[in-house]
């Protein structure tokens, strides 16, 4: 959940061991997104940077406490994906 993620990230700011675990999880998630983005033809640094932007966008969305309905998120999903991936999917 977003609240759990935020709480763990706050904890990680104060505990190096927790920070190491959070970083490892973040790295795995970014690696998974990189593989996904590579399926759309991006390679190397471009795939990694697009994956990071996508991940940081989602983490930031939760960190800022954004609130919108699922309907609104689904409506905007194609726009987000075009901005993050670079073309319509």
Language-model segments: which ranges?
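Acidic, metal/ion-handling microdomains and their immediate structural contexts
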Residues: 12-13
